[in-house]
């Protein structure tokens, strides 16, 4: 049984850092484990221009504690009105690494998202030409589609036509949650990748309802059936370079999670690599963790691997019950429980 594992320093290819006091509270958790992260642009207002991304990047770097090294990889928020010229500027900037597609209303702060992907044709053509990846929240938002089917329907309605019309466009299917998505990404032609969260590797939808409503397990896309969790584990541990780490760590104040209309999102930045190690260990695939965490993402984005390392040790430790979060608190996933791995 492996007791210690040292891997190339990993990256997080899907992260929510928020802004202001919330940013300052959560950024150190990510920077302790990850060298770089793709930063989601769904602030209020959303980050839709290169100038806004530059300003947000500056705020992130200003919030980084002294002595910590971390590179934020910025993204733009795609709207019906994003001009192709903004894509050219994004490519030239050197710090914008993707454009995020949120179907309007799909998740937190997505109201300004795309209402019809066909309206973005000229912009998508510019992205294909400039080599700027499209990062996709892969769910339809039609009220007549069951919430557990939104991802599968998205593949047929949006992803397949998108890939047909823009076959050379780099596409990341973010935080996949279904067997359908894992199979689609594995078999798709052209430059397609996918991020997978730790919580979707570890839990199925029963976790939300065990002994009562468990709001800290509620995220979007929502946890699915066990057959889907198993398919995600198989994909993540397959060795395929198309699958890579993206925590989708999404902090919300405790009062906004434990609420009559609670927010979606699991906070895992504090203990992300410990959770991934647990999932890969349970699958008997610790030898595949480094590629998933540290190699596949940089290869897809055309970036070099990190030079540092991170060590995971089989060691019991108790996760805090809550964490400071501005003038309130934040509850990490599995708060107060014992974890079996420790990252250093």
Swiss-Prot record:
Active site residues according to the UniProt entry: 248
Coiled coil feature spans: none
Cofactor: Zn(2+)
Name of this chain's protein: Dihydroorotase
Gene name linked to the record: pyrC
Role noted for this protein: Catalyzes the reversible cyclization of carbamoyl aspartate to dihydroorotate.
UniProt keyword annotations, A-Z: Hydrolase, Metal-binding, Pyrimidine biosynthesis, Zinc
Pathway involvement of the protein, from the record: Pyrimidine metabolism; UMP biosynthesis via de novo pathway; (S)-dihydroorotate from bicarbonate: step 3/3
N6-carboxylysine PTM positions: 100
Species annotation: Cupriavidus metallidurans (strain ATCC 43123 / DSM 2839 / NBRC 102507 / CH34) (Ralstonia metallidurans)
Enzyme class, broadest EC rank: hydrolase
Cofactor binding description: Binds 2 Zn(2+) ions per subunit.
